Amino acid sequence: MFTVNYILDLFHTINATEVQHTLMHKRPASLHEVLRLAGLLQGYKDFLSLTKQAEAFFQAGDYRSAFNTISKMWVHPQIVPALLLMECFETRELTVPYWYKSIKLRRQYIQKKNGGVRPIIVAHKGLRICMAVINRLLQSCCVSWSNQTFGFRPGFGTHHAVLHLAQKAQQMLNKQQQAVLVTFDLQAAYNSVDIKHLMQTLQLQYLPNDMKKLIWMWQHLPLAQLNAGINGLAQGYAYSPTLFAWYVDQLVGQHMDFTIYADNFAGVFLTQQDAQFAVKEAQTLLQKSGLLIAPSSIKMHLLDKNQHSELNWLGHKVLFPSCTVKLQHHQLLVNQHSPQVWTIQKWDKMLRTLGWVQLALNADWRRF
């Protein structure tokens, strides 16, 4: 015979189980769960393993072997689909990949803080996730960059660059009473890039042929408003910042004592004459590629142990002579139209409805 307490305990047990089950169904799905659901988890694991191999080759300066490893990732039946799903997971939007069909791009102009505008190429969402996959494959090259080249990967943001510059200034002021800090930017940096020279410098001829063809094809897509092509390296493509930073590192970062973030340069020198000479030497190295230093951007900052001053660089501030860094914290904007919770049930429904996995696994887009 069931007692009242037994019935109550049983009710609470069932209720607690249902609540736990409900919470599991309501919580956001993890990346691993989504990849497992799509049958692409092994592809992701293989990507991580092969990326380590590629990084080791890049660090050793063996570009041919590094690109051969990237080729293995490219032709792997699951790696590219897994990376596509990763991009969708991060944006919480299941987008059908759109590799290279004939489309026209849009150009938007973003206001710069220092005046002027920056032309940004806006690609179709389906094309953007494909470009992002190319970027993930290329980013194994970052380990070969100078430790003075920053940007576009974890652990090398603007604040890391400013901290690095402040440390160099501190080291210089520890040795002597004064120093000179010089900053400058490149003129129309992305638009001035010679794509052929970039590909030769970075030895991209060793990339898989289809990857090269895609990059070259995307580079020559027409702009809808102007019915014209893209000048230089397209701003707005996911892989462009990686290629540009790598290119500048090869041209200058590996040879000179500058802290570099994208097209922003800063260095600390003993005297103004040394600083001026360094700027001229940097321009000589850059001229081989057609890139130019913007003359109006060259600024000399005198640092003195007995004088207080400050430098604003990359949105952050350095106080002298203490070399203290005050970081600017940017508030992240949340897209109000994005769902806050994507459960595994939601992912399952979307993947099935679109037939997304079958579309992503279709390797026809690799064949030209």
UniProtKB/Swiss-Prot annotation:
Domain of life: Eukaryota
PROSITE patterns recorded: RT_POL
Localization (cell): Mitochondrion
Domain Reverse transcriptase stretches: 91-318
InterPro entries assigned: DNA/RNA_pol_sf, RT_dom
Broad class of where this protein is predominantly found: mitochondrion
Keyword terms of this UniProt record: Mitochondrion
GO annotations of cellular component type: mitochondrion
Identification of the protein by name: Reverse transcriptase-like protein
Species of origin: Chlamydomonas reinhardtii (Chlamydomonas smithii)
Encoding gene per record: RTL
